[in-house]
Amino acid sequence: MAKFFALKNFTALSDLHPNMANLKIIGIVIGKTDVKGFPDRKNIGSERYTFSFTIRDSPCHFVNVSSWGSEDYIRSLSESFRVAECVIIENPLIQRKDTEREEKFSPATPSNYKLLLSENHSMVKVCSPYEVDTKLLSLIHLPVKESRDYYSLADIVANGHSLDGRIINVLAAVRSVGEPKYFTTSDRRKGQRCEVKLFDETEPSFTMTCWDNESILLAQSWMARETVIFASDVRINFNKFQNCMAATVISKTIITVNPDTPEANILLNYIRENKETNVADEIDSYLKESVNLNTIVDVYTVEQLKVKALKSEGKADPFYGILYAYISTLNIDDETTKVVRNRCSSCGYIVNEASNTCTICNQDSSRLKSFFLSFDVLVDLTDHTGTLHSCSLSGSIAEETLGCTINEFLTMTSEQKTKLKWQLLLERSKIYLKLILSHRARGGLKVTILSCKLADPTEASRNLARQGHT
């Protein structure tokens, strides 16, 4: 089909200046914010509404566009197009931008100007991709920052608190996209959030959180272990609840999906090469918590953990701690206790043994996913103050603790499994834990082991002495 809209028929963003009139601009939408309402100072008791978006018409030129007006007009305009669609803007007002003030909350652009849309005079039309020059459509895969200007996920984790509050760029692949969660704040404002798990060659899992509808909508289109993103200007913070670094999509952020850059292509090849073959990486990514153990410093006794859990009643957030204790129950040689299970390679959940399908991914049995074997062991942890029952020890952490792989374990005789059990039982260990309140768990506390290694006797004695016991 012929291209109806050639770039030469429109004013280029590079040619903008304040005295221009009767403009017609075409561009691809590369970023967009949610609609917001503000008290109208001219009409007390009423509100004005606004949203903004960013358009691009060439590799080097993109501008921010804002619109103010009535709620009906703004919501209708916002809902008429999405990120990655091409739009024609007629009769916008050109204004010189206050770079320092405006780019604090808006995407940084190379232009000295911004566009304002008037409810009475401006118009926005959405173009069909079949009507647009392919050069324009290809811009959606070009990051707005230099392709090598980004942090690897391992660099973010390694830098830790030194990056807290910083705004940086990230190139990563999508590990998983969570379901949007909706909530109401204490002042009755409705909100939403969506957690995206990212990974790259250096880090198996890293959290990026979306708080606005536009980025959540965009994220819902991403394919796990197939989509690569270049996220420009995300905020990095230390997540005190998960004890790790995490990224947040903010109003400055522009996300380029499947960027056409050498660096992104290398990452994409890494995903494809490891998608089916590297089972160990799959196990790590699903079952090994992406928590920097160096950030967990609080030492507890079992009794103290139970008291802390009681004080945290009503809170959904996990807490973390170190426990010097013994593994007092470890049923790995009991034929009636299943300690190795199938997990879904797509989502990491335990496979239903009766149907041999994943109940999370496979409502339709014709869409069977591949599975992998994983340790799934429940252990009791005991110190001088009490016992934590049914603590989860799984995946690669279980392999490290037991000192053997899944395949090695499956070839062991019952006698060998019993010998392995007694090598681990009643040995004082340094154990890193994640704890979360759960009415389904035994004792109301779900405990996940993040690391379990033999304790250094001097270190253990010193910490236990502080608690009045050696």
Swiss-Prot record:
Tissues of expression: Sprecifically expressed in early meiotic germ cells: in adult and fetal tissues, detected in fetal ovary, postnatal testis and liver. In the ovary, expression starts at 12.5 dpc, reaches a maximum at 15.5 dpc and decreases to become undetectable in post natal life. In testis, expression starts at 10 days post partum (dpp), reaches a maximum at 20 dpp and is maintained throughout adult life.
Cellular component, GO annotation: chromosome; cytoplasm; nucleus
Listed GO MF terms: chromatin binding; single-stranded DNA 3'-5' DNA exonuclease activity; single-stranded DNA binding
Origin: domain of life: Eukaryota
InterPro entries named in the record: MEIOB, NA-bd_OB-fold, OB_MEIOB_N
Chain residues forming the annotated DNA-binding region: 167-272
Effect on the protein upon substituting residue 235 to A: Impaired DNA-binding and exonuclease activities
Enzyme class: hydrolase
Effect of inactivating the gene: Mice develop and grow normally but show infertility in both sexes. Infertility is due to a meiotic arrest at a zygotene/pachytene-like stage. DNA double strand break repair and homologous chromosome synapsis are impaired in meiocytes.
Keyword Cytoplasm: yes
This enzyme's EC code(s): 3.1.-.-
Location of the protein in the cell: Cytoplasm; Nucleus; Chromosome
Functional summary from the UniProt entry: Single-stranded DNA-binding protein required for homologous recombination in meiosis I. Required for double strand breaks (DSBs) repair and crossover formation and promotion of faithful and complete synapsis. Not required for the initial loading of recombinases but required to maintain a proper number of RAD51 and DMC1 foci after the zygotene stage. May act by ensuring the stabilization of recombinases, which is required for successful homology search and meiotic recombination. Displays Single-stranded DNA 3'-5' exonuclease activity in vitro.
Name of the protein in its database record: Meiosis-specific with OB domain-containing protein
